[in-house]
UniProtKB/Swiss-Prot annotation:
Gene (UniProt): Thop1
Top EC class for this record: hydrolase
Protein name, per record: Thimet oligopeptidase
Family: Belongs to the peptidase M3 family.
Residues of the active site: E474
Single GO BP term: intracellular signal transduction
Subcellular location: Cytoplasm
Lineage of source species: Eukaryota, Metazoa, Chordata, Craniata, Vertebrata
Modified residues (Phosphotyrosine): Y278
Catalytic reactions of this protein: Preferential cleavage of bonds with hydrophobic residues at P1, P2 and P3' and a small residue at P1' in substrates of 5 to 15 residues
Oligomer and partners: Monomer.
Record-linked Gene3D superfamilies: Collagenase (Catalytic Domain), Endopeptidase. Chain P, domain 1, Neurolysin, domain 3
Amino acid sequence: MKPPAACAGDVVDAASPASTVNHLRWDLSAQQIRALTTQLIEQTKCVYDRVGAQNFEDVSYESTLKALADVEVTYTVQRNILDFPQHVSPCKDIRAASTEADKKLSEFDVEMSMRQDVYQRVVWLQEKTPKNSLKPEAARYLERLIKLGRRNGLHLPQDTQEKIKNIKKRLSLLCIDFNKNLNEDTTFLPFTREELGGLPEDFLSSLEKAEDGKLKVTLKYPHYFPLLKKCHVPETRRLLEEAFNCRCKEENCAILKELVSLRAQKSSLLGFHTHADYVLEMNMAKTSQTVATFLDELAQKLKPLGEQERAVILELKEAECAKRGLPFDGRIHAWDMRYYMNQVEETRYRVDQNLLKEYFPMQVVTRGLLAIYQELLGLTFTLEEGAAAWHEDVRLYSVRDAASGEEIGKFYLDLYPREGKYGHAACFGLQPGCLRQDGSRQLAVAAMVANFTKPTPDAPSLLQHDEVETYFHEFGHVMHQLCSQAEFAMFSGTHVERDFVEAPSQMLENWVWEKEPLMRMSQHYRTGSEAPQDLLEKLIKSRQANAGLFNLRQIVLAKVDQVLHTQTDADPAEEYARLCQEILGVPATPGTNMPATFGHLAGGYDAQYYGYLWSEVYSMDMFHTRFKQEGVLSPKVGMDYRTSILRPGGSEDASAMLKQFLGRDPKQDAFLLSKGLQVEGSEAPAC
């Protein structure tokens, strides 16, 4: 990559007019990452300097708004090339260089967001531009820049701005370190085969051996969740649950306390009562009081269900203790929850998770999932053989509109765990689908990163049903990234209100609870036979199993997040323990500190974890109102969905998109019914 001449608005190899170009590259050395980071900062700053130095009479749409939009497109792509490898590179040196690049670029982002000279010229542009002379999305972009400027305090005295800038820089570094600590955690616990009683042979044979011959169980998802669900040795579950919720306890506890304190300081300087109120101003909920009411009302409705489910679990535990000759203490512990919730599915609903996963080999699930998405959204996916990526396991697909044949994007699938890799499942937007400087459309590129069970020499990767659900969910985010047709990078893909962003992908989770889609993505890994009808019917009926406890736990996490961002002196571990007891009725394990492992708190979901439940109101309404009524695999409804919900990206308000797709304002009825709750009369409007 050669640097462009002088201070051109296009940064590093961005002048190609071909809209089907993937500008991403994954072959950079640590040294190149460092050099290109410096270069990117210099070239981008050059554009901001030019905009900020203009005489006010020279300020125009082209010289100001378009210049900022163009540099945002190219900066975003180059930044992702430099900071994405920290999550996925197999090489520790490159991960470290990428993390450092992210820190430098985050500091730079803060500097550019605090450019009062640029802000003044944007405000001037709005004042001198006749109303309705800009296209709607350009006007929205102009308004958003001014709103963001005010939210950064650019209308406040210089000394206040300086304080805000320093806090923002520190916050960026702390967030990066918080999640890096979790990603780089290599803790494992050694157990004998007897201590792992109840786990299937394919799981045991996939474990590495320690020097003393014991089996290594890591704290990564493909080890942690199966063990907590299936291991019938309570002490093993206790040790693992305790270790899992003590990850990075010391270092992340200190980071979290500083994060919460600094966020409160910054919000106060900006005139907000709490950090939650600052964050929520940009969301559908608007205020922390609205969120508190939503969570409290839902918790009240779910509590009776939770009590019934806890009683069932205690019965199961008493029977299990008698069967295995173990003392029964009459209590449910944190390490009991997943084990007995799994037993509820297996005993009350007769769902055998070990048998079920034999029908979900990765290749079959992937083939079925991709076919369903193509059919539903009018798309065609093609595997790009031998495409360059960051690891040999990664696959790259090209996506075309089925009707026109036009390429609209590409996506990477990186599905298996590796040391140092991002530990959860997520979609990363890597190249925004938007207009480039020359007016051509830039190809959207996204990556789905997950940690599903790896194949072994004896068996392919077999997915638990909840992993199939996760796959559908995250791939829904990928489709949002690729199907959006915004003009500005700021509104591309999933750049919607944070308490709506989960709705499009949550809605698509419904397909893994419907018989026809399940038939299409299941097949026995050895015999090739289709999944028995009764097995799938039992699975579908089990959807509401444990709905009370599962959703009460989501409320606990959402409330911890809200408490930390409304009461600055709250102790995270104490608040989590209090809420677990009050809402879930199951105590947190003494000595653990779950919030120190809660990546969302430092991953852009601060004061916004409630959004998972809030957006489910919309996802359930969309599914039941349109797809369930008109056909779960209806290409017509699928295309309406692509057009009304995915295509705008963030270029319209979520409420307007929902009204367009539903034909009315959203309601909570479908959401409450999906939780096993009764809807009394006519339910109040959504949220």
